Amino acid sequence: MNNNTLNITNQRTAAAMSQIYFLVVYQTAVMIVSLLGNLFLLFVIFRANQVMKRRVSPVQLLIIHTCVADLLFALLSLGTEILTLRTYPQYYGSNFVCKLMRYVQMFPMYASPFLLVAISADRYQAICRPLAHFRSSRYRRPNWMAAIAWGLALVLSIPQFFVWTKHSKTGRCSTIYGQNKNTVKITYVIMFNTLAWLLPSILAAVFYYCVCKAVRLSSTKSVRAMDSQKRNGKYSSGATEDYIEELRKKSKGFRQQMSEFDRKRVQTVRLTITIVACNFFLWMPFCLINVIQALWPEISHIMFINYVAILGNLNSCLNPWIYILFNRSHVRKALCRSRRSFTEVTKKRSFENFECSSTATMNNNYNNCHAYTAFSNRSQLKFDSYATDSTSLKTNSN
């Protein structure tokens, strides 16, 4: 009987160690990919702006803050968790180190969604309230939003000092309420999932709903204004309107100037919506299972929660690659060998465009000149014939 019990215990220990080994390998891979991706994104942003001789835009500034939050998540959250799993089931740090470790693990998990809300609020301010956006400083508002996000993350992570402790009997760094159902556990779990996942997702969704609504209304108003102008007869004649429209279609610079701003604005909105959606759906299984485990602890197992948390950890890996996918031109510019090569390519393209436009202009002038010469010849013929007729009239009269 004792041998059977010992065998069952050994089997459970071996199964637990294999699961821990899998978690260590997986989290190490996620940490490495997240570090490489976010560092590469920082290089792309700074290098592309350096090549194009531009300052970092407000949206890029907030994305840089998000990259820093993801880097801290990879180093502080995943890195310390890997070290803890390596020494499982013992924890060799002190009680204060246990509390501090759990605090720094939670800090990036609050900072990342708060920064996504800051990006959403910045886009709402720029598109839905453009006058207030241009009156305020271009970089002061994003800096204040980022500072508020970091400050809230620091404050809301403080309960970790009271929830976690190192137990003297087991020697583990675990929560004070354990695995059983507890009022403190339910309150803390619901508070974390509401503040770090649900509330930021709702705020970002509200901001982007207002942004999409404003874009749709502005396009509808522009169409209605054009229709009303046509009805009131404010446009020129049909021939003149067709001529102007044809010139606009032929003008490459006009098309680029009119579409560049709208394209960048829509692209930025799509980028941030994609990042917010990924954050919501990747953390949703972990947050829901965490709440279920707090309310009904007998249903789920702790290792099952660890496996579900795998999806949430992927968020720090996907964010930089989403930005790179939406800004492939920046990546190409950042990967140029030098600024000189990029400048030479730009000058070459500009020279080719200038040459083509100059050729077209010369052809245009030549055609106009040819038309004017033909018109002058016809006028000269008419004048000569008129002069001949006048001479003959004078001769007849004499």
UniProtKB/Swiss-Prot annotation:
Q: Where are the transmembrane segments?
A: 26-46, 59-79, 100-120, 144-164, 188-208, 272-292, 303-325
Keyword flag Cell membrane: yes
InterPro entries attached to this UniProt entry: GPCR_Rhodpsn, GPCR_Rhodpsn_7TM, Neuropeptide-GPCR
Primary location group: membrane
Residue intervals on the Cytoplasmic side: 47-58, 121-143, 209-271, 326-398
Sugar attachment sites: 3, 7
Cite the entry's keywords alphabetically.
Behavior, Cell membrane, Disulfide bond, G-protein coupled receptor, Glycoprotein, Membrane, Receptor, Transducer, Transmembrane, Transmembrane helix
At the top level, the lineage of the source is Eukaryota
List cystine links.
98-173
Q: What happens when the gene is disrupted?
A: Viable and fertile. Males have reduced reproductive success, due to a range of aberrant mating behaviors. Double knockouts with ntr-1 partially rescue the reproductive phenotypes.
Q: Which GO molecular function annotations are given, in alphabetical order?
A: G protein-coupled receptor activity
Q: Which cellular compartments is it found in?
A: Cell membrane
Found in which tissues?
Detected in the ADL sensory neurons, the RMED and RMEV motor neurons, and the PQR tail neuron. In males, detected in SPC tail neurons involved in spicule penetration and sperm transfer, and male-specific oblique muscles involved in vulval contact.
GO cellular component entries: membrane; plasma membrane
Q: Which PROSITE patterns match?
A: G_PROTEIN_RECEP_F1_2
**All ranges on the Extracellular side of the membrane:** 1-25, 80-99, 165-187, 293-302
| Mode of membrane association | Multi-pass membrane protein
Indicate the family of this protein.
Belongs to the G-protein coupled receptor 1 family. Vasopressin/oxytocin receptor subfamily.
Main role?
Not directly activated by nematocin. May modulate activity of the nematocin receptor ntr-1, leading to reduced intracellular cAMP production. Plays a role in male mating behavior.
Q: What is this protein called?
A: Nematocin receptor 2
Per the UniProt entry, what species is this protein from, by scientific name?
Caenorhabditis elegans
